[in-house]
């Protein structure tokens, strides 16, 4: 999972920010329980601050600082994906029409499959958000929701972590 630019100075003005934060927390908890890869990006952290502390994983994640809007232009990030043999990016964060869109479009061009968590991304302006979603899906990105992707990752109720996963969803 790729969490893009959830920094305090940016998120203040995001539409539906409380819901976005709540869903990213659910995703983080599920990803940590299921021991899935977590990557975090920060756009110009010296000016925009760092990732909101409550949205940092407990352990086992990689953080990338960037100046380009697209994380997919950062060689260090691309090397990490290659080393971990990751070809499907699950994306959440802000802002849909800037850093998310540029990262997604560049990733699709590089051959990655991209899934957008529609209820865990946002922009300041809903028109920008909606148009960016349309552009990314027309380019090949897949839309899903927080709950859907969590159950997709879990795969079965027989999995030992299922009860914990169900509890995350029910919160």
Segments (PLM) and residue ranges:
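N-terminal nucleotide-binding beta1-loop-alpha1 segment
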Residues: 1-6
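A short alpha/beta connector and helix-capping loop motif
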Residues: 14-40, 45
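Short acidic, Gly/Ser-rich segments with clustered Asp/Glu that frequently serve as metal-coordination loops
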Residues: 8-13
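Active-site-adjacent betaalpha module
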Residues: 33, 46-171
